[in-house]
UniProtKB/Swiss-Prot annotation:
Belongs to the drug/metabolite transporter (DMT) superfamily. Small multidrug resistance (SMR) (TC 2.A.7.1) family. MdtJ subfamily. Its main location: membrane. It comes from Yersinia enterocolitica serotype O:8 / biotype 1B (strain NCTC 13174 / 8081). This is Spermidine export protein MdtJ. The chain crosses the membrane at residues 1-21, 32-52, 55-75, 82-102.
Length: 126
């Protein structure tokens, strides 16, 4: 199961690199940025497709997009001098909260440690 989470992590990293390369290519006009973008976005979708074999689609997609948006926004501010308004910050905080809710909502309930009552054993009751 752990390998599928690794696939998801690689999908997120590839998406971030691909999207930042797209911005770099549009600013610089260099062909290299477009080539990196094509390979990274393609790789991102391939890794995401592998991840959703065992990771719930809603969780995988929320993490893939959400973490990607968060990190891309930070690097866009640092590298491309994009603005970060209080409204954008509030949106990112809401996004992180939403990701946490989606992820925590998919946990499997823990099995009780008590013996199974339907195992054929009969107990006297008072």
């Amino acid at each position: 199961m752990m390998i599928y989470w690794i696939f998801l992590g690689l999908a997120i990293v590839a998406e971030i690199i691909g999207t930042l390369s797209m911005k770099y290519a549009s600013v610089s006009g260099e062909l290299t940025g477009h080539i990196v973008m094509y390979f990274m976005i393609t790789g991102s979708y391939i890794m995401l497709a592998l991840a959703v074999k065992k990771v719930a689609l809603g969780v995988a997609y929320a993490l893939w997009e959400g973490i990607g948006i968060l990190i891309i926004t930070v690097f866009s501010v640092l590298w491309f001098d994009e603005s970060l308004s209080p409204l954008k910050i509030a949106g990112l905080v809401t996004l992180v909260g939403g990701i946490m809710l989606v992820k925590s909502g998919t946990r499997k309930p823990k099995k009780p440690n008590s013996p199974n009552r339907n195992s054929g054993e009969h107990h006297a009751t008072a």
